[in-house]
A protein has these predicted regions:
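FAD cofactor-binding and catalytic pocket of flavoenzymes
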Residues: 324, 335-456, 499-507, 513-518, ...
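A conserved FAD-binding loop/helix module that cradles the flavin
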Residues: 538-554
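A glycine-rich dinucleotide-binding beta-alpha-beta segment and adjacent secondary-structure elements
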Residues: 243, 248-253, 466, 470-539
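Glycine-rich loop(s) and the adjacent beta-strand/alpha-helix scaffold that form part
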Residues: 52-55, 59, 66-71, 250, ...
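Conserved redox-cofactor binding core of oxidoreductases
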Residues: 125, 136-249, 257
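N-terminal Rossmann-like FAD-binding beta1-loop-alpha1 element of flavoenzymes
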Residues: 34-62
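Fungal secretory targeting signals
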Residues: 1-25, 280, 532, 561
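N-terminal FAD cofactor-binding segment of flavoenzymes
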Residues: 55-61, 65-121, 142, 147-151, ...
Length: 561
C-alpha cells in the first residue's frame, strides 16, 4: 500500500530547491487562489506543459499526488552507501531495478491497478531512463494532420536542447558489463545482418539496426524533466508545485471547467480557475482517462456503471454528462517476452541496493563512473515485420540486460527482452473497479482476432534464433530449434517470462478521436486538455521521448489560447 507523504510545497525556489516561499501559506492560500492553468500530474508531460504555460505568463499550478523523489526535490530514500550525499535512490541509474522489489513511496501502490510512478517526475523518476527519438513513420502514419513529423521538428529540437540523449554515461569514458553487448553484436551484426549504429543519430531507421542504449542521464545521474524543465519553472513567480494532492475530478459547469476537486492534507478542496483558465490532465494513460470519467466525461455506458456504483457525484446527473466514447479506449502496452540466454563468454552482473560491490560504489561516488551509471541495459535493436496486405509494418524491439531473470540467474546468464511496438492491432481500455481504482482491461495483449500480433512477434524471435549458431549464446527457456508455432504458443501463454505488463501505457485518449489536434482539448469541453501518454499512438520505441515531444508541442499550442 502506498504511504502518504507529508505535504511538500515548492514555489519561487532556486534550482537547488533551497527554501520555500517566504510568504506564509496562510497569507496566500493556493487552494483559494484562481489559476490560469492547473496541471494535474508532475510526470514527464505535466512538468513540460507547466513550464511552457508559466513561461508564457500563465499563473500555473502543478499538482502531484505523490511526494519527493530526486535529491533535488528533497527526496531522502536511499541506501546506506549514499549517506552524506545529496542524492536519493532516484538519482542513481543503477538502482533502477530496486523499485520492483522495494518501491518505497515512489509508485502508485493501491491507487492504480498497474505499476507506475506517483511522485515528482512520475514514471520518469522510476523507469530505466531509456530515451529514443521515435522514427518519423510513427508520427506520419499514426497521427493526424498537425502532428506529423514535420510539425514536430521544432518541438523535438527544443526537447533535445533541454534534455540530451546520452550513450557515454560513465564519466571515465568506459563501458561496463559488456560481455552481453559483445555477444549480442556477434549474434545480430555479424550473424543476422543488423547494422551497428548510434541509434539516435539515425532515428528514422528502425529496420535491422543494433546499437547501445541512449539514456536521459546527466553526469552519471538520472536526468529527465525534473532536472531541467522543472528547474526553470521554479524560478518564476507565477508558478507553484504542490505535492501530496489527490485530484478527484474536474469541476465544471456544462462544457467549461471551473476548477478541480482534490484531497489535500485530509481535506477536500475545490481549487478554482480564473475566468479564462484551463485544466490540463497529465496523470498518464490510465489516470487521466479515469479523471475524465469521474468528471462525467466519457462513454455513457461506462458513466452509467460508475454512477450506479456512486463513483460520480450526484450533482453530475446524466443530463450533464459529456459523451466522448474515445475516453479510455485504445489503451496500449508493449507485449513482451523474456528470453534467458547463456554462454561461456558471459559474465552477468546483478545490481544491489543494500550490499553492492564496494569498489563499484566507490567508483560511482568518487567519479560518477562504473556500473551504477546506467540501468543495466547494454544493447538494443529493432526491425520491422512487413505485411502483404499493405498495412503498416509491425515494429519489434529487443533489449539485452546484464543479468538473468526468474529461474535463470547464474553468473553466465543474461536476459533478452522482446517487445512488440508500433503497428500492433491489439489494445484494451481503461476500466475502473467498484472501489474507483483504474487499471487496464484484460485484453491489452494479443487480442486481435486474427492473431497477427502474436504471429509477427513469433516471426521476429524465430528469425533471431536462426542466427544463433556461431554466436556462443544458447536460449534457456525457449529451445533454440523451436518452430514459429511453438514460439507463438509460448509468448501468448502467461508466465513469468511472457505476457506480463511492461507498463509503457499509452494511447487511451488519442489525438483526433478523444482530444482535438489543435490544442489537445478534450472533445465536448471548452477548456479541459490532456497532455501525456494518453494522446500518442503506440510508438516504435520506449515512449518517454515521444511523450515529451508531445508535451513540448501541446504546451506550445495551449499557451496560445
Amino acid at each position: 500500500m502506498k504511504l502518504i507523504h507529508a505535504p511538500f510545497i515548492v514555489a519561487f525556489l532556486s534550482s537547488a530547491l533551497a527554501a520555500p516561499l517566504s510568504i506564509s501559506l496562510g497569507e496566500q492560500d493556493w487552494t483559494k487562489q484562481e489559476w490560469d492553468a492547473i496541471v494535474v500530474g508532475s510526470g514527464p508531460a505535466g512538468i513540460i506543459v507547466a513550464d511552457k504555460l508559466s513561461e508564457a505568463g500563465k499563473k500555473t499550478l502543478l499538482l502531484e499526488g505523490g511526494g519527493k523523489s530526486y535529491g533535488i526535490t528533497g527526496g531522502t530514500e536511499k541506501p546506506d552507501w549514499l549517506a552524506g550525499t545529496n542524492m536519493s535512490r532516484v538519482d542513481i541509474p543503477g538502482l533502477y531495478k530496486s523499485i520492483f522489489s522495494d518501491p518505497g513511496d515512489l509508485t502508485c501502490g493501491s491507487t492504480v491497478n498497474a505499476f507506475g510512478g506517483c511522485t515528482i517526475g512520475g514514471s520518469s523518476a522510476v523507469n530505466a531512463g531509456m530515451f529514443f527519438q521515435p522514427p518519423s513513420s510513427d508520427w506520419d502514419t499514426y497521427h493526424p494532420d498537425g502532428w506529423k513529423n514535420a510539425d514536430l521538428e521544432d518541438a523535438t529540437a527544443r526537447l533535445l536542447s533541454r534534455q540530451a540523449t546520452v550513450t557515454d554515461y560513465s564519466a571515465d569514458g568506459n563501458y561496463y558489463l559488456q560481455t552481453g553487448y559483445e555477444a549480442a553484436k556477434k549474434w545480430l551484426v555479424d550473424g543476422a545482418g543488423y547494422s551497428n549504429v548510434v541509434i539516435n543519430d539515425q532515428p528514422h531507421d528502425k529496420t535491422k539496426v543494433f546499437g547501445r542504449p541512449a539514456y536521459d542521464y546527466n553526469k552519471g545521474q538520472r536526468g529527465g524533466p525534473v532536472t531541467t524543465y522543472l528547474q526553470t519553472s521554479l524560478s518564476r513567480s507565477n508558478f507553484l508545485l504542490q505535492s501530496g494532492v489527490r485530484v478527484q475530478r474536474v469541476e465544471r459547469t456544462g462544457s467549461k471547467a471551473t476548477g478541480v476537486v482534490a484531497t489535500f492534507d485530509g481535506t477536500t478542496v475545490t481549487i478554482p480557475l480564473s475566468s479564462n483558465g484551463r485544466v490540463v490532465l497529465s496523470g498518464g494513460a490510465i489516470q487521466s482517462p479515469q479523471l475524465l470519467m469521474m468528471s462525467g466525461i466519457g462513454d455513457p455506458a461506462t458513466l452509467s456503471q460508475l454512477a450506479s456504483s456512486n463513483l460520480i457525484p450526484t450533482s453530475l446527473n446524466p443530463s450533464a454528462w459529456i459523451n466522448n466514447t474515445a475516453v479510455g479506449a485504445g489503451l496500449f502496452d508493449n507485449p513482451n517476452t523474456f528470453i534467458e540466454l547463456t554462454g561461456p563468454s558471459i559474465a552477468s552482473y546483478t545490481y544491489s541496493y543494500k550490499s553492492p560491490i564496494t569498489s563499484d560504489t566507490l567508483m560511482y561516488l568518487s567519479s560518477k563512473s562504473g556500473p551504477y551509471t546506467f540501468a543495466s541495459q547494454t544493447s538494443v535493436f529493432w526491425t520491422t515485420i512487413p505485411h502483404s496486405d499493405g498495412t503498416p509494418a509491425t515494429g519489434v524491439q529487443g533489449t539485452i540486460d546484464s543479468a538473468g531473470y526468474g529461474d535463470f540467474v547464474d553468473d553466465r546468464t543474461i536476459t533478452l527482452n522482446v517487445y512488440g511496438t508500433s503497428g500492433l492491432l491489439s489494445s484494451g481500455r481503461v476500466v475502473i473497479d467498484s472501489k474507483g481504482v483504474a487499471g487496464p482491461s484484460d485484453d491489452i495483449y494479443y487480442s486481435d482476432a486474427a492473431g497477427r500480433d502474436a504471429s509477427d512477434i513469433a516471426t521476429f524471435i524465430h528469425d533471431l534464433f536462426q542466427a544463433l549458431p556461431g554466436s556462443g549464446l544458447t536460449p534457456l527457456n525457449i529451445p533454440a530449434n523451436a518452430t514459429k508455432e511453438e514460439i507463438q504458443t509460448y509468448i501468448t501463454t502467461p508466465s513469468q517470462y511472457a505476457k506480463g505488463q511492461v507498463n509503457h501505457w499509452s494511447s487511451s485518449c488519442r489525438i483526433g478521436s478523444c482530444v482535438d489536434a489543435e490544442a489537445l482539448r478534450v472533445k465536448g469541453t471548452d477548456n479541459v486538455h490532456v497532455v501525456d501518454g494518453s494522446v500518442v499512438a503506440p510508438l516504435t520505441v520506449n515512449p518517454q521521448f515521444g511523450i515529451m515531444v508531445a508535451a513540448e508541442k501541446g504546451g506550445e499550442l495551449i499557451a496560445k489560447l
